Regions:
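Nucleotide 5′-phosphate-binding alpha/beta core
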Residues: 1-88, 94-111, 115-119, 124, ...
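Active-site phosphate/ATP/adenylate-binding loop shared across adenylate-forming ligases
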Residues: 4-6, 63-232, 250-257, 406
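Anion (oxyanion) recognition and catalysis
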Residues: 31, 149, 262
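Phosphate- and divalent-cation-binding pockets in alpha/beta enzyme and binding domains
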Residues: 36, 40, 165, 187-188, ...
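Short, well-ordered beta-strand segments
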Residues: 127-130, 287, 376
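Generic structural signal for residues in well-ordered beta-strands
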Residues: 155, 237, 268, 359-361, ...
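AMP-binding/adenylate-forming catalytic core of the ANL superfamily
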Residues: 178, 292-400, 422
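Conserved AMP-binding/adenylate-forming
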Residues: 219-313
Length: 435
């Protein structure tokens, strides 16, 4: 794999030429080593030499999650003896998919995360506290650890949860940054306030935030980002976007104007429902082609994530594409009473209602064949006035009011973290079961 972190600061023409060369190499590798993609090329009547630019990719079909689930072995490009690590996707939109990684792929992950941390302002002088799991077949936790080592930062592998242990570690070692699911920061603050910890004077100065959006499409803070910043203004938050399929992390810089796509690791297209490119500034599905992955590379993979792309050069000097936070998942789009909604918009509203301790959003198909939404709210308040307040808030924000059902906080907490899950569940889609 050719690594060129400086290419992101080059001219648009130089970036395009660099990526075209990497793309041609990737296409040749796929045709030679991937049973799935060789079959796809032959079926389309295409040859590797036909694909020379990103525009040429449109001649090829997209790869879907279903393709991965139906033909997992056909995507593997190396003999079993070269596979040294196995990970799985989280299974947000279906059965988890297993990915096989080679030594080169782990080196690539380390390089990517080291560059991501650098984009977020980290240096070898930093000590990073890893507040996420590194086990349970989770690629990202391992990638963060490898990337921090690559950058020669200190690393503290605390794992997820347990605020008491997190604060004890912060007190003992004095980390300067953390890798964390941002909503957990609110729990750290709550624990600190309950136990007299002066968290605003702690050693932490930056948080690399994973798994949840912090920004709106105008790059301002969403409700979660604003809440954390209000509670802990000394802590600078950096938004990231990544997935197991991408084997790449996209991270924002200190200007907080979208995540910078690493040009030497991935190609990104933003497509509409007909697989046509969307105009700049319009929402589109993120479709990725990995560069330099050896074990299970992907070509034109539909992530299901809806984002907005920007090509204007950032104030930091990088000229590669920038991506907004994920607006929603294509498979999770809800059409409720004539209004198109994505779960993150509903999360944003609920996170900002005082008295809502936790929640799960359920969507199902009603008797008339239309989408219906139930908000299961964990709260100490369970009166009609609070229900009306919640519904009125939704009407003012998104013009529609879902059904509200109050549940014990403990019940919702258990539903959010099933025994085999490594991700907190806030959205349950029952539409296939209730058609």
């Amino acid at each position: 794999m050719i690594r060129n972190p400086e290419i992101q600061f080059a001219s648009a023409d130089a970036i395009a030429a660099f990526q075209q060369e990497r793309l041609r190499e990737e296409i040749a590798y796929l045709y030679e080593n991937s049973p799935y993609y060789r079959r796809m090329f032959d079926h389309c009547g295409a040859r590797p030499g036909d694909i020379r630019t990103q525009e040429d990719l449109r001649r090829l079909p997209v790869t879907t999650k279903t393709d991965l689930q139906l033909h997992p072995q056909d995507f593997i490009c190396v003999p079993r003896s070269r596979i040294i690590d196995y990970v799985t996707t989280s299974g947000t939109l279906g059965d988890p998919v297993t990915f096989a990684l080679t030594e080169e792929d782990l080196d690539r992950l380390a390089y990517n995360e080291a560059e991501s941390f650098t984009t977020a302002g980290c240096t070898p002088e930093d000590v990073l506290q890893l507040m996420t799991t590194i086990d349970r077949r989770f690629m990202a936790g391992l990638a963060y650890f490898l990337g921090a080592r690559k950058l020669r930062c200190g690393v503290i592998r605390v794992g997820n949860g347990i605020p008491e242990l997190q604060w004890d570690t912060i007190r003992r070692i004095g980390p300067t940054g953390c890798i964390v699911v941002p909503s957990f920061l609110t729990k750290l603050v709550a624990y600190a306030e309950e136990h007299g910890i002066d968290y605003r004077c702690s050693s932490l100065r930056r948080a690399i935030c994973i798994g949840e959006a912090l920004r709106d499409t105008a790059f301002g803070n969403n409700t979660l980002g604003a809440k954390i910043t209000e509670l802990w203004p000394e802590l600078e938050l950096f938004s990231t976007y990544a997935s197991t399929e991408m084997q790449t992390s996209i991270t924002e810089c200190g200007h907080h104007c979208g995540g910078h796509v690493p040009a030497d690791l991935i190609l990104v297209e933003l497509l509409d429902e007909q697989n046509n490119p969307v105009a700049e500034g319009e929402e589109g599905e993120v479709v990725i082609t990995t560069l330099g992955v050896r074990g299970m590379p992907l070509l034109r993979f539909r992530t299901g994530d809806i984002c907005i792309g920007y090509t204007e050069r950032c104030a930091c000097g990088r000229g590669t594409m920038r991506l907004s936070s994920v607006i929603g998942r294509k498979g999770q789009m809800i059409k409720f009473k004539g209004t198109t909604l994505y779960p993150p918009a509903l999360y944003d509203i609920l996170e900002n209602i005082p008295g809502v301790s936790n929640y799960i959003i359920e969507v199902f198909t009603g008797s008339l064949g239309t989408d219906q939404i139930v908000l299961r709210i964990g709260s100490a308040r369970r009166d009609e006035a609070f229900e009306k307040e919640i519904k009125d808030t939704f009407r003012s924000k998104v013009r529609v009011a879902p059904e509200v059902v109050f549940e014990p906080v403990e019940y919702i907490a258990k539903k959010q973290m099933p025994q085999m899950s490594r991700k907190q569940i806030k959205f349950v889609d029952l539409r296939e079961q209730t058609k």
